[in-house]
């Protein structure tokens, strides 16, 4: 720096460099300090500016957040308002729906009443008609007899004819009226059905609207939640931004510090460059060491080979030790067996000895005398002792052998453990060595591969060189020619095989075409069967739904029953509470009487106590007055004594006389003390007087209470308040009794209602059980049908195949591709039979459920068809047996049935879910389902 400055000044080298004096040095120091302060102040200024910027950005974010929260609050308020609005709408709608339901119920009730009235009228009219018909028959007979008897009375005959005509007219009018009423009834039913459908549709619309509203509400909630989440995220981000701003300021500070460090590091770098040269030298030394390591590696490789040899020898030793161990185990097992045999033999000998002893005893007892017995026994004992000693010796020997063997076994087990541990160690070392071997083998293989590739490359280069030179061997030529011949032969063979394969492929294509056709037929059949199965499943589902409805109805009845029970319980509780109130009032009356008696006794006791207290207070007052008098007399005495003392206590001559002030002070002190005592006594007197006054007041109160109590025992006059209260209480009691009787009547009625409800519940349960039984029967029947359909599938396939073959043969014979007249005739008969079956089914349904007749009639009229009646059923039943066989034969032809079904006009019958249809099983709602059921029945037959 100084050299540059001197160069700018054109300072010559010969002259000495100028040095600043002390003042300039101080100025330079001050300047450097000021520069440092300036730099620090600039840094602080930058920091403050950055803080201001961050604060302004934070303020903006806060403002934005505030606006967002306000908007969110407004949205919440709007949501609450909308919810309240919707709630109010829903409540109004609910009220309207309730009114509508009530109106409909009233209308239903009125319609039912009208219906019952009409039915009664029809019944009466029919009864009258029957009576008139009977009269007509009787009148006709009488008329004929009378005409035979008197033919000459023409005028009477004319009158009779007139009456008969009048009767006929009446009958016709009644029949017309009956028909008109039935039509009106049908119309009313139609109107009722329409109303039902309208209500159901309105209900569905309402449900849909409610669902839509719920969806919208949920979406709105989700939006608000998303909004809240976004706000939270924004807040988090704002916090992150603030943190980042702080971090940025900190980083900037760090960068400044690091810049200073960098300057220092540059100098350090220059020094490190010098060090690097030294390290390069060291690296060269390390390379030399690496060469040495490689040589060492080769040495290790040789040692590895040696270790491998040692490992093999160790393996051999391990195998040898394992075989020795096995032999030892076998020996131990043999020794154990020998010991077991020896112990068994010893036991046998002991048993044998015992048997011999018993025998000896028996023999000696029988034959020998006492002395002989004794001598024999002694001999036997000696022999036995000898035997026992011998056995003991043998046992000791065996024990010694066993002990030795056990020790040997322990040593062998210890050896085995040691050998096993050695084996484990050798195994682990083996694994390690094997791993190293694998690594080395892998490296050698790599090296060999490289070698082979290099050799192959060299050979290829040599061949290319020879070819370039034009050198080809005769052997190579011959080999190439032989290869060409072989390739030609293989080409011809492949051509022939290719031709064969093409022919086979054509055949396979044909087979595939036929298989596809068969598969399509099978799929159609499968689809038809699946539709049948689906229809059966629908039937089962409907029956299950009806069962669920029955269960729901049962549950409603149970709920009503429980509600009634609750009402009964409530009434009982009310009754009990009223009874308890009556009892409590009576108890209260008795308690009042007892309390009055107790109170009188207490008042007497209190009187006596007060009298004694008054006496005690009078005595105290007399005592205090006596004390007061005594004290006054004492004061007089003290005064006299004082005068005497003053005379006595006059000082003798020569002594100083006590001053008058002394005696005045002393007297004042004594006076004050006396005054205090007097004040205390006055206070006590005042207190006693007050107590006396209070006692007098209590005495007056007691006297007034006693007077009232005495008056209460007097007879009550009609003009008094007590008499009026008594009358009121009696009236209340009468009202309570009447309520009690009314409640009892209500309870009886409720019990009767409960009984009737229980009876109806039993009936409903019985109906539900019947429905369940029917459902189980239907399920079993459906399962049977599905089984039968599965069984009929192969037959159907066979029949369809036969039919297809026959139709093909017939068409080939007639040289036509279109349908023949016979086929059309068969289809027509099938159609007729199908219609007959459907008609029979409809007639059966109408017979089972008379209410469905009107619905079916309306649907048939809409589609321009006539409803089948029961009169046609008989004729159809008579013709069913011959046509049944033809139908079962024709039902196997799936192709013809599928075409015939396509031409049928489908009637969609939608029945109302009324309670009258609970008992009857639900029918399929389309002609296709009924046809499938009929077919399945026919196939099962």
Swiss-Prot record:
State where the protein is found. Answer: Cytoplasm, Cytoskeleton, Cilium axoneme
Q: Show the coiled coil region(s).
A: 16-122, 164-273, 306-605, 665-825
What Pfam family is a match, any one?
CCDC39
Phosphoserine is carried by which residues? 892, 900
Q: Which InterPro entries match?
A: CCDC39
In its keyword annotation, does this UniProt entry include Coiled coil?
yes
| Main function | Required for assembly of dynein regulatory complex (DRC) and inner dynein arm (IDA) complexes, which are responsible for ciliary beat regulation, thereby playing a central role in motility in cilia and flagella. Probably acts together with CCDC40 to form a molecular ruler that determines the 96 nanometer (nm) repeat length and arrangements of components in cilia and flagella. Not required for outer dynein arm complexes assembly.
Q: Indicate whether Plastid appears among the record's keywords.
A: no
* Organism, scientific name: Homo sapiens (Human)
**So which disease is it linked with?**
Ciliary dyskinesia, primary, 14: A disorder characterized by abnormalities of motile cilia. Respiratory infections leading to chronic inflammation and bronchiectasis are recurrent, due to defects in the respiratory cilia; reduced fertility is often observed in male patients due to abnormalities of sperm tails. Half of the patients exhibit randomization of left-right body asymmetry and situs inversus, due to dysfunction of monocilia at the embryonic node. Primary ciliary dyskinesia associated with situs inversus is referred to as Kartagener syndrome.
Q: Where is the composition biased (Low complexity)?
A: 871-903, 914-934
One BP term from GO: neuron projection morphogenesis
Question: What's a GO cellular component annotated to this UniProt protein?
Answer: cilium
Report the domain of life of the source organism: Eukaryota
Which keywords appear in this protein's UniProt record, sorted alphabetically? Cell projection, Ciliopathy, Cilium, Coiled coil, Cytoplasm, Cytoskeleton, Kartagener syndrome, Phosphoprotein, Primary ciliary dyskinesia
Q: Please give the name of this protein.
A: Coiled-coil domain-containing protein 39
């Amino acid at each position: 720096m100084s050299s540059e400055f001197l160069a700018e000044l054109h300072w010559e080298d010969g002259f000495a460099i100028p040095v600043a004096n002390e003042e300039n040095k101080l100025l330079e120091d001050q300047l450097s300090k000021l520069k440092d302060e300036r730099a620090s102040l600039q840094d602080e200024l930058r920091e403050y500016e950055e803080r201001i910027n961050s604060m302004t950005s934070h303020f903006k974010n806060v403002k934005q957040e505030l606006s967002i929260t306000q908007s969110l609050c407004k949205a919440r308020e709007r949501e609450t308002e909308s919810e309240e609005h919707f709630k109010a709408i829903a409540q109004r709608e609910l009220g309207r729906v309730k009114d509508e339901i009530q109106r409909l119920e009233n209308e239903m009730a009125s319609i039912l009443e009208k219906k019952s009235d009409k039915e009664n009228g029809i019944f009466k009219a029919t009864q009258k008609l029957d009576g008139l018909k009977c009269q007509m028959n009787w009148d006709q007979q009488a008329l004929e007899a009378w005409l035979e008897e008197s033919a000459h009375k023409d005028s009477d005959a004319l009158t009779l004819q007139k009456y008969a005509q009048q009767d006929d007219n009446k009958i016709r009018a009644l029949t017309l009226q009956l028909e008109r009423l039935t039509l009106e009834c049908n119309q009313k039913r139609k109107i009722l059905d329409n109303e039902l459908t309208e209500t159901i549709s309105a209900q569905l619309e309402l449900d849909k609207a409610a669902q839509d509203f719920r969806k919208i509400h949920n979406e709105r909630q989700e939006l608000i939640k998303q909004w809240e989440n976004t706000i939270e995220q924004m807040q988090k981000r704002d916090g992150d931004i603030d943190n980042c701003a702080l971090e940025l300021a900190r980083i900037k500070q760090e960068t400044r510090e690091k810049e200073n460090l960098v300057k220092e590091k540059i100098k350090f770098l220059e020094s490190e460059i010098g060090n690097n040269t030294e390290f390069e030298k060291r690296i060269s030394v390390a390379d030399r060491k690496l060469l040495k390591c490689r040589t060492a590696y080769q040495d290790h490789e040789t040692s590895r080979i040696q270790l491998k040899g040692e490992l093999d020898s160790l393996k051999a030793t391990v195998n040898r030790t394992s075989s020795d161990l096995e032999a030892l185990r076998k020996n131990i097992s043999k020794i154990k067996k020998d010991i077991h045999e020896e112990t068994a033999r010893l036991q046998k000998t002991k048993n044998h000895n015992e048997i011999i002893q018993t025998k000896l005893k028996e023999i000696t007892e029988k034959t020998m005398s006492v002395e002989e017995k004794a001598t024999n026994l002694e001999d036997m004992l000696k022999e036995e002792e000898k035997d026992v000693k011998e056995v003991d010796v043998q046992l000791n020997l065996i024990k010694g052998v066993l002990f030795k063997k056990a020790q040997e076994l322990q040593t062998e087990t210890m050896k085995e453990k040691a050998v096993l541990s050695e084996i484990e160690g050798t195994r682990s070392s083996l694994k390690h060595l094997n791993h190293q071997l694998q690594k080395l083998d892998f490296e050698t293989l790599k090296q060999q591969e490289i070698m082979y590739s290099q050799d192959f490359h060299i050979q290829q280069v040599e061949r290319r060189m020879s070819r370039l030179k034009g050198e080809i061997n005769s052997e190579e030529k011959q080999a190439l020619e032989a290869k060409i011949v072989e390739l030609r032969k293989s080409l011809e063979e492949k051509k022939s095989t290719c031709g064969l394969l093409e022919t086979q492929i054509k055949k396979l294509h044909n087979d595939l075409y036929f298989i596809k056709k068969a598969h399509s037929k099978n799929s159609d059949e499968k689809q038809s069967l699946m539709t049948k199965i689906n229809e059966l499943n629908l039937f089962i589902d409907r029956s299950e739904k009806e069962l669920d409805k029955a269960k729901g109805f049962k549950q409603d009845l149970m709920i009503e029953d429980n509600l009634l029970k609750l009402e009964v319980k409530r009434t009982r509780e009310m009754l009990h509470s009223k009874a308890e109130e009556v009892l409590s009032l009576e108890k209260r009356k008795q308690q009042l009487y007892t309390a009055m008696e107790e109170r009188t006794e207490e008042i007497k006791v209190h009187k006596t106590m007060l009298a004694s207290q008054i006496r005690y207070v009078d005595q105290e007052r007399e005592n205090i007055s006596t004390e007061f008098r005594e004290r006054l007399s004492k004061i007089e005495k003290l005064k006299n004594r004082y005068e005497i003392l003053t005379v006595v206590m006059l000082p003798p001559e020569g002594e100083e006389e006590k001053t008058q002030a002394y005696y005045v002070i002393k007297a004042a002190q004594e006076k004050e003390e006396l005054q205090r005592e007097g004040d205390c006594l006055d206070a006590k007197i005042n207190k006693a007087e007050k107590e006396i006054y209070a006692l007098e007041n209590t005495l007056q109160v007691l006297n007034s209470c006693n007077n009232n109590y005495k008056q209460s025992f007097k007879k009550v006059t009609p003009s008094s308040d007590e008499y009026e209260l008594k009358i009121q209480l009696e009236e209340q009691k009468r009202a309570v009794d009447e309520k009690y009787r009314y409640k009892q009547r209500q309870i009886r009625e409720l019990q009767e209602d409960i009984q009737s409800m229980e009876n109806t519940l039993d009936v409903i349960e019985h109906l539900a059980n019947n429905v369940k039984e029917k459902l189980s029967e239907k399920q079993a029947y459906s399962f049977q049908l599905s089984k039968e359909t599965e069984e009929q599938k192969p037959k159907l396939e066979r029949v369809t195949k036969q039919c297809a073959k026959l139709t093909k043969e017939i068409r080939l014979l007639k040289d036509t591709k279109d349908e023949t007249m016979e086929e059309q005739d068969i289809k027509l008969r099938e159609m007729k039979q199908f219609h007959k079956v459907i008609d029979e089914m409809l007639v059966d349904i109408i017979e089972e459920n008379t209410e469905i007749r009107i619905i079916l009639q309306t649907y048939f009229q809409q589609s321009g068809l006539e409803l089948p009646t029961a009169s046609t059923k008989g004729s159809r039943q008579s013709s069913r047996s011959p046509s049944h066989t033809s139908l079962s034969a024709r039902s196997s032809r799936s192709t013809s049935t599928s075409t015939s079904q396509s031409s049928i006009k489908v009637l969609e019958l939608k029945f109302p879910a009324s309670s009258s249809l609970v008992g009857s099983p639900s029918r399929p709602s389309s002609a296709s389902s009924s046809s499938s059921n009929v077919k399945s029945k026919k196939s099962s037959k």
